[in-house]
Curated annotation (Swiss-Prot):
This is Small heat shock protein hspG2. Keywords: Stress response. Residues 33-200 form the sHSP domain. Belongs to the small heat shock protein (HSP20) family. It comes from Dictyostelium discoideum. Residues 86-139 are annotated as: Disordered. Residues 88-101 have a biased composition (Low complexity). It comes from the Eukaryota. SUPFAM superfamilies: HSP20-like chaperones (SSF49764). Residues 106-117 have a biased composition (Acidic residues).
Length: 200
């Protein structure tokens, strides 16, 4: 025969499972299929007339930040890109474009039959391929990492506003991004809009 403690323990375990399932479903609802690599630091201050949210995002471009309010949750998300990798990709694209343009130039050059001496052409081609090989080896040498301590990738931060949302004027949201600090300011509603309860 089960004691009252066994019954209470079973009920408690069932409630915990239900609550955990609700939390997981909420997380899944707000999580995009991107991996979150960085959780930025945040300060939230409430003054008499506004709510101030400051988030540290050093090294992040202004264009890579997305701010949303959904179901009374403020979501700050984006991507901190590695500038070296971005630079390498741009250089690679430029080199591909230049190689394509040199291939087009080769089409404009006279054919081998029009050259008086075939040996000059072969020596020029050999020099060009040697120069390209030298450029590849020097670029691979310059990309060695000695120390790598900075973080890059996707970031996301949530702020639950459900307890104070009724006090805020969402039409007055103001954002600033300067020196790696994102500042979101939301004004409070004026006193005229506050709900006052009458005593009975």
């Amino acid at each position: 025969m089960a004691t009252i403690f066994d019954i209470l323990k079973t009920l408690n375990n069932n409630n915990n499972n239900i609550n955990n399932n609700k939390i997981e479903s909420c997380k899944r609802q707000y999580t995009v299929n991107k991996r979150i690599d960085i959780i930025p630091s945040m300060d939230v201050t409430m003054t008499n007339d506004k709510l101030i949210i400051e988030t540290e995002l050093p090294g992040v471009s202004k264009n890579d930040i997305d701010i949303n309010i959904k179901d009374s949750i403020l979501i700050i998300q984006g991507e901190k890109k590695n500038n070296i990798i971005k630079l390498q990709q741009q250089q690679q694209q430029q080199s591909e474009k230049s190689s394509q343009s040199t291939n087009n130039k080769d089409d404009d050059e006279p054919s081998i039959e029009e050259y008086e001496d075939d040996t000059k052409l072969k020596s020029n081609l050999n020099k060009n391929t040697e120069n390209k090989d030298e450029n590849k080896t020097t670029s691979s040498i310059t990309n060695k990492k000695f120390i790598s301590e900075r973080s890059f990738g996707n970031f996301k931060r949530y702020l639950n506003l459900s307890e104070i949302l009724y006090q805020l004027d969402l039409n007055s949201i103001n954002t600033q991004f300067e020196n790696g600090l994102l500042t979101i300011t939301i004004n409070k509603k004026s006193d005229n809009f506050q709900i006052k309860l009458k005593s009975i």
